[in-house]
Regions:
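Nucleotidyltransferase catalytic core that binds NTPs
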Residues: 2-277, 283-291, 317-318
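Generic C-terminus detector
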Residues: 301, 305-307, 311-320
Length: 320
């Protein structure tokens, strides 16, 4: 049996709040299952003691935010939304090796657990699930039964450049859903194709979890918040704003009545004329199926991926 533990940390809430938050840390699947089995009764006992039951509700609404850690304001916005919509909030921190190709950055992906835990405690997160790779893939990631999304979602855009990515995402998300058993899960729209894969997963496989997409959180200069922004040097960080400028140009041309080909060509040229960019794709797609569009027709999404030096960035603009 894997040597695991369950621990907890207590953090005083931010200034202006009287709440003292107790964030529990669970590292093993066995402890998570035990927590999930008793969550309803413990929550109801606490609510009755505080005389705060919600219209006779006898079980908590559990919200779930799956992450790979290295948390930033974009992640915290997901937690904030979960806190507003749910009674109990669970955040997982697991850098999933199954979604990284051999040449990708699994080994150097930022791991900042202590800081992540501090942020989550301040946000009032109830539980952090922090498993090891051995807990999630006891026989190894190459021996697990995998979930492979259908080709239209799996093989285009991100999938064309990261062919194993969505298989890894879908597999670990389904496993986490089965373990946490949330009522609702929150994903950022910044990873738009991933969001559509997860929505298709729960719809096609009848997984009883509501999926909520939360709009992209941006820096003041428009750069989408991402854990990989930490890889950018000072000059690259300044240049990185060009990606959102390119997307915004497509949206501006769409609003002016231009067609997709002209708009994407102009935006692609903008990036090619800037220093250090290698454009991988810039496309206009249907908002749900991600089928490529030749004319702007709502709902649509403008999606792009490009490398700035050695750092790969993705972004999008959603037009509902």
């Amino acid at each position: 049996m894997t040597d695991t533990k369950t621990s907890a940390t207590t953090s005083t809430a931010p200034a202006g709040s009287k709440e003292t938050v107790r964030t529990q840390i669970i590292e093993s699947l066995a402890d998570l299952r035990a927590w999930r089995a008793q969550t309803g009764s413990l929550w109801l006992k606490g609510q009755k003691a505080a005389k705060e039951t919600r219209g006779g509700a006898d079980s908590p609404r559990i919200g779930f935010v799956p992450t790979m850690g290295a948390l930033h304001q974009g992640h915290l916005e997901l937690v904030k939304r979960a806190k507003a919509d749910c009674d109990v909030v669970v955040v997982s921190i697991f850098v999933n090796p199954f979604q990284f190709a051999p040449h990708e950055d699994f080994g150097k992906y930022p791991r900042t657990f202590e800081n992540d835990l501090k942020l989550l405690s301040e946000m009032g997160c109830d539980l952090v699930f922090y498993p090891s790779e051995k807990e999630i893939y006891p026989r190894g990631k190459d021996s697990i039964m995998a979930v492979v999304p259908p080709s239209p979602l799996n093989d285009t855009l991100e999938g064309a450049f990261r062919p194993t990515f969505f298989r890894g995402v879908a597999t670990v998300v389904l496993k986490l859903f089965n373990l946490v058993q949330p009522h609702v899960a929150f994903f950022g729209e910044k990873d738009y194709q991933q969001l559509q894969v997860v929505k298709a997963l729960v719809e096609d496989l009848d997984v009883p979890v509501e999926i909520v997409g939360v709009p992209t959180v941006r820096e003041s200069d428009g750069l989408a918040m991402s854990s990989r922004n930490a890889y950018l040097g000072a000059a690259e960080r300044t240049e990185a704003t060009s990606l959102y400028k390119a997307l915004s140009l497509v949206k501006t041309m769409a609003d002016a009545g231009k067609d997709v080909a002209d708009a994407t060509a102009a935006a692609s040229l903008l990036l090619k004329e800037e220093k250090g960019w290698t454009l991988q794709y810039l496309s206009v797609c249907h908002g749900k199926s991600l089928a490529p569009l030749t004319q702007f027709q709502k709902p649509y999404v403008i999606v792009t991926a490009a490398k700035l030096g050695e750092v790969r960035l993705i972004d999008n603009i959603v037009v509902p």
